Amino acid sequence: RLTEQIKALRRQMARELGFVIPAVRIQDNMQLPPNTYVLKVKEIEAARGDIRPDALLIMNPSGGKMDLPGDDTTEPTFGLPAKWIAENQREEALFRNYTVVDPPTVITTHLTEVIKDNMSELLSYAETQKLLDDLGKTQQKLVSETIPSQISVSGVQRVLQNLLRETVSIRDLSTILEAIAEASRSTPNVHMVTEHVRSRLARQISHANTGPDGYIPLV
């Protein structure tokens, strides 16, 4: 189940972000405490949590007390009060309108947030080159006239990483590369190039941040 959820997550991220994140490896580590999992990005720990393979995690959406027997804990992704309960208490938990999450989903949810927090690091030089190669099949002139005469592949990678760091999707790579070509004629500064790209993606960025009511929430 966990493996299938991770595959689905990678497909979802590819649709949303515009590139395929690296494969996720699952490994046993006997040095970890019991029931502990660790999520790493490039071999460096990014997050950890506790899991009960034979239990269910419940949370009360109202924030109130959860009147079911079990072990109190903290939901690992968002730090919410939670409780591990036996699987045979699922129906009772649902009847009480608690949120019920199985162990694979707990890990996948945590992994999703780790990916979002580290998107820029996950876009490698090789993946950037692949994106440009794929774009070159339909936009050959744009790619050949821009790279490497105006900007290098690593320069494009840095611009894309800047966008991902701001949770801006890079799906519309042709518009992004057009904007890079425009800006790089007058400046080699990657951050200034990114600013120009961001302005060209204004409609996309606004749409992505628009709520169901048609308004963009401001804090």
Name each model-derived stretch.
Residues 1-219:
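Membrane-embedded alpha-helical signal segments
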